[in-house]
Amino acid sequence: MMTLSYIDPIAFELGPISVRWYGIIIAMGILLGYFIAQASVKRIGFHQDTLVDIIFWSAIFGFIIARIYFVIFQWPYYVQHPIEIPMIWQGGIAIHGGLIGGFVTGIIICKQKNINPFQIGDVIAPSMILGQGIGRWGNFMNHEAHGGTVSKSFLENLHIPDFIINNMYIDGKYYQPTFLYESIWDVLGFVILILLRKHLRIGDTFCLYLIWYSIGRFFVEGMRTDSLMLAGDIRIAQLMSIILIIIGVVIMIVRRVKYDAPRYKAVGPLSWPSKEVK
């Protein structure tokens, strides 16, 4: 097995600036997602600048809202440490906040450019879930987003590389590698979406992304020890996962009943709103 001792969250330093693995890995996920989506955009016929605008601005505002979302639910801490609020490189962003910010930004751009949001959502959805799967390794590098304590033998029985086991040893205890579970789930989701997309109607791939990601996140979140809590034992991420599953299912049903959406591979660029009504 591959062996590696403790991984320093800081990849390298440029003078007074510390560059963390967390940021590097997040950036890698975004770039890889862009290149994958680019191939689909070419096939459909969207202009390349459209994809750049949507991914760039959705990523920017997604990160901003993800941080605001996290800070809001950790306000008792940040009100005492306001100087740490912009320190996003230390971790502390909430994916669901990022999804909200990214979705809203993407919809606004689609409206401005007269693009069908469901069609572009189908293009980007596989890239999004792959990027999320890659991004979880940023949590690993930061030694965060893990589950409860376990024994070393438990981790060894998972047959995972030694470097993961070694870096799940935090403050004298071994922890459940929940980042890995979610990463594997997301990568599997990416493969499934890519394989199914050409057979689905426009909008279905995006909805399946919401459903698939949320199912995995719901169960993984139940193992984590750092969940944002709403009240009592209600985990915000689990509540949001349920909401997104419902949204995904409802949109799929409504679009099948009310609209005659073409298949993903059968058409070129569609406008906003598309002429799909039965």
Curated annotation (Swiss-Prot):
Enumerate the GO terms in the molecular function aspect. Answer: phosphatidylglycerol-prolipoprotein diacylglyceryl transferase activity
One Pfam family in the UniProt entry: LGT
Record-level GO cellular component terms: plasma membrane
Keyword check for Transmembrane, yes or no.
Answer: yes
- Gene Ontology biological process terms, A to Z: lipoprotein biosynthetic process
Q: Which gene encodes it?
A: lgt
List the EC numbers from the record: 2.5.1.145
> Could you tell me what this protein is called?
Phosphatidylglycerol--prolipoprotein diacylglyceryl transferase
Coiled-coil features, chain-numbered ranges: none
HAMAP family given in the database record:
Lgt
UniProt keyword Transferase, yes or no: yes
List residues binding a 1,2-diacyl-sn-glycero-3-phospho-(1'-sn-glycerol): 136
Q: Which family does it belong to?
A: Belongs to the Lgt family.
UniProt pathway annotation: Protein modification; lipoprotein biosynthesis (diacylglyceryl transfer)
How does this chain sit within the bilayer? Multi-pass membrane protein
Where does this protein reside within or beyond the cell? Cell membrane
**Taxon lineage:** Bacteria, Bacillati, Bacillota, Bacilli, Bacillales
Q: Which residues cross the membrane?
A: 21-41, 54-74, 88-108, 176-196, 202-222, 234-254
Function statement: Catalyzes the transfer of the diacylglyceryl group from phosphatidylglycerol to the sulfhydryl group of the N-terminal cysteine of a prolipoprotein, the first step in the formation of mature lipoproteins.
Q: What is its main location?
A: membrane
Keywords, in A-Z order: Cell membrane, Membrane, Transferase, Transmembrane, Transmembrane helix
Instruction: Supply the InterPro entries for this chain.
Output: Lgt
